[in-house]
């Protein structure tokens, strides 16, 4: 899976989670990989 696909999936999940719960998730799983808050925020801030 390309990083742009990973970023898009993380972004969708994080937005939905924030919309329904009012806070960002502690971690996000994409495929078989579990990203911590710090890791997925780094990915979301990347310029691709």
Stretches with model-predicted labels:
Residues 2-48:
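Acidic, low-complexity, intrinsically disordered interaction modules
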């Amino acid at each position: 899976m390309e990083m742009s696909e990973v970023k898009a999936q993380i972004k969708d999940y994080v937005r939905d989670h924030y919309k329904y719960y009012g806070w960002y998730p502690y971690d996000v799983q994409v495929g078989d990989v579990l990203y911590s808050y710090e890791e997925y925020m780094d990915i979301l801030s990347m310029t691709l």
